């Protein structure tokens, strides 16, 4: 199959990594897969089999010759419909119209979702959200993930414990400011710990002034992230329900990292019973959950055992199996039947 993924940006992010993983797995199966993006190829991802075309979508040769075109963000849907050939899909990793940061363009986002595409969802809850907003049915394909890359040796006993918090602090979706506020509260109570932060963006003035962060890592390459997880003792994932899928939380579970996660559909889908949950957006509850893990070694050990098998249930090859079936079925439906 000639498959094209339309990528809005090659900047480091979990959503971009998911797209590149899907493309690479399908290319390894013999399909002609091209990622088309107006930006240079990402240096942080080891791309081996899939092709990369740096081009405006309107001028893309691969898109003009595609059998399957996959939009991966709301801004790429219209180009996929306008310039793609064959069957057009829309890979949904979160419903952008519900994000506070996209409120000024929410009407444009809804218009993009109304365009004639076959929708793909990472989770059952996201499928429900799309249906509730009038965007029709979506196929749940699951999350592309390689748990083996994050396998970690037993953590040494060390004090103080280090807490890893991932994501951009600006904006509501990731809940990072909720998490940092909770950690500041715990520091004020005299709890001893270190805070490790990782984000694709520079340290913000707000976070610097808060003064709770001990180490800040910017734009860590995908192949270096496992080592950062191994340096931590706890993972804090405070994202809000609008977040379609929290990839760092899954990576933390695969790394045997005890996790305190917000009680959202995405986290329940990825973590099951392998994490300690707290109400999303509740700074006091976040502080209590983190304090529990800081003080309870046995609970940390229990969650560390549960994480890897749970994360191992998400496999890129399973996602590729589903995509191949959907792509072939859609392409057959697009082609006129023989007389």
For each predicted feature, which ranges?
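Nucleotide-activated donor-binding/catalytic signature segment of Leloir-type glycosyltransferases, i.e.
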Residues: 203-226
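Acidic donor-binding loop of glycosyltransferase active sites
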Residues: 230-244, 257
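Membrane-proximal helix-turn-helix segments that form the acceptor-binding/catalytic region
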Residues: 58-64, 102-122, 126-127
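A short, well-ordered alpha-helix in the C-terminal region of glycosyltransferases
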Residues: 292, 299-313, 325
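Acidic anion/phosphate-binding donor-loop and adjacent secondary structure
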Residues: 97-103, 131-132, 140-160
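Conserved donor-binding/catalytic core segment of Leloir-type glycosyltransferases
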Residues: 4, 120, 155-174, 180-187
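Short acidic alpha-helix that forms the nucleotide-activated donor recognition element
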Residues: 61-64, 221-232, 254, 268
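Conserved acidic donor-binding segment of nucleotide-sugar-dependent glycosyltransferases
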Residues: 276-283, 292-297
């Amino acid at each position: 199959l000639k498959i094209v993924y339309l990528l809005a940006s090659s900047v480091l992010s979990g959503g971009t990594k998911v797209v590149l993983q899907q493309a690479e797995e399908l290319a390894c199966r013999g399909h002609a897969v091209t990622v088309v993006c107006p930006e240079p190829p990402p240096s942080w991802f080891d791309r081996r089999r899939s092709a990369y075309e740096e081009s405006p979508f309107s001028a893309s040769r691969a898109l003009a010759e595609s059998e399957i075109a996959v939009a991966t963000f709301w801004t790429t849907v219209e180009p996929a419909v306008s310039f793609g050939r064959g069957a057009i899909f829309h890979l949904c990793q979160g419903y952008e119209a519900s994000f506070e940061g996209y409120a000024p363009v929410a009407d444009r986002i809804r218009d993009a979702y109304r365009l004639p595409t076959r929708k793909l969802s990472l989770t059952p809850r996201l499928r429900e959200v799309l249906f509730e907003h009038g965007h029709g049915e979506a196929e749940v394909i699951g999350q592309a993930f390689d748990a083996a890359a994050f396998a970690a040796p037993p953590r040494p006993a060390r004090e103080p414990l280090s807490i890893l918090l991932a994501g951009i602090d600006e904006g509501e979706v990731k809940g990072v400011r909720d998490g940092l506020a909770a950690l500041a509260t715990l520091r004020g109570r005299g709890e001893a710990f270190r805070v490790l932060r990782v984000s694709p963006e520079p340290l913000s003035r707000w976070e610097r002034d808060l003064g709770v962060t001990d180490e800040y890592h910017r734009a860590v390459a995908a192949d270096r992230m496992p080592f950062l997880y191994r340096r931590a003792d706890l993972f804090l994932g405070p994202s809000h329900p609008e977040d379609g899928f929290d990839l760092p939380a899954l990576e933390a579970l695969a790394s045997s990292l005890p996790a305190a996660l917000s009680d959202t559909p995405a986290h329940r889908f990825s973590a099951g019973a392998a994490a300690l949950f707290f109400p999303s957006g509740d700074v006091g509850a976040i502080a209590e959950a983190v304090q529990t893990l800081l003080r309870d070694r046995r609970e940390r050990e229990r969650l560390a055992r549960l994480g890897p098998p749970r994360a191992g249930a998400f496999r890129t090859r399973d996602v590729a199996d589903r995509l191949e079936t959907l792509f072939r079925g859609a392409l057959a439906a697009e082609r006129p039947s023989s007389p």
